[in-house]
From Swiss-Prot:
Keywords from the named record: Cytoplasm, Methyltransferase, rRNA processing, S-adenosyl-L-methionine, Transferase
Biased composition (Basic and acidic residues): 368-380
Family: Belongs to the methyltransferase superfamily. RsmH family.
GO biological process, one term: rRNA base methylation
Compartments reported by the entry: Cytoplasm
Catalytic activity: cytidine(1402) in 16S rRNA + S-adenosyl-L-methionine = N(4)-methylcytidine(1402) in 16S rRNA + S-adenosyl-L-homocysteine + H(+)
GO CC terms, sorted: cytoplasm
Enzyme category, top tier: transferase
Domain of life: Bacteria
Protein name: Ribosomal RNA small subunit methyltransferase H
Gene from which this protein is expressed: rsmH
Gene Ontology molecular function: rRNA (cytosine-N4-)-methyltransferase activity
Amino acid sequence: MDVDVQDDVQGRAGEGAEERAHDAARRHASVMLERCTRVLSPALDHPGAVTVDVTLGMGGHAHELLRRHPGLRLVGMDRDPQALELAAHRLHEFADRITLVHSVSDGLGEALDDLGLDTVDAVFFDLGVSSLQLDEAERGFSYARDTALDMRMDPGAPTTAADVLNTYSHSQLTRILRVYGEERFAPRIASAIVRERALEPFTSSARLVDLVRANVPAATRRTGGNPAKRTFQALRIEVNDELGVVERSLPVAFERLAPEGRLAVLTFHSLEDRIVKNALRELSSSSAPPDLPFVPAGSGPRAELLTRGGETADEAELAENPRAASARLRAVRRLPGEDRVSSPRVVPASRRRNRPGTGTAGNPARPRTQEFETHPHLEPGEPGATVERTP
């Protein structure tokens, strides 16, 4: 892992790098910029605040956070060295407040250890392939142009999309097409790939697009855009282990948050969004049995959800940036003092069981006598030491 690579990438950028950075920034509009900034900002309004953008990309969200918070220190991570190079130029005015790290996001813990940071105040994820990668034909992410089948977010990674196509078994290809591409015709496409590669290995995206088009029903070819898009998504996710990286990164990111710290995640397809939704829901839920009158220490919610469902871009942004259409934003705040003591459970009225004496139909309400007992494992006066006992 290369820590603090800012000087290095600036030194290697060469003539024209700043111009390329400005051009790329102009073409790459940061998705849900205002909403992402607002959801993170309350954790950054204090001296010495530190945030991590673990998928820095072109640095659009990072630039806005640094602009709004003059005392903020930012750690920017990305697995794509080209993105780091361009982001270094875009963020040059904040050079004394940023540290750039060449790493996949699941290397967050190691990166913070190397920088001597035990906790941070905010962590931001902007998942999926970037506009920069889609627009660079030689990267092989786009099915709209004929190019080499690469799809590596980090060009130094060992496995390309061509390697997957030419070496995976029929069952492996079927699995990734079905699971990662949600492709209904996965077995048929996998069979065609195995058959065609025996004649000649796959090297170009155009040949793969033609193969997919020839092996899906005519009705599918006429609707829903390019029929190869699901196959390309599946290959990209497999080559970069995108879902595995998300699953490994989120727990590390939350554990490194300071109390009141905030975690925000932008997703762009249902597979990664499902992982994020489940992880954040688990953090914001109690693991105690629902019938207990108190929440035992260690089983209470660790986070508060800051977004209702997956928030989406508004109509004005969609008109300006169609790529924002699939974006979903989810965020949580780490609760202070979570997991340290037991606390009384408050059960919403809608979840209370119908019992005699609660005023339900057929059971006239009668006065209840509140009795209290001391929890055996807590000292009197501690939060949660006294709980209501239902007679």
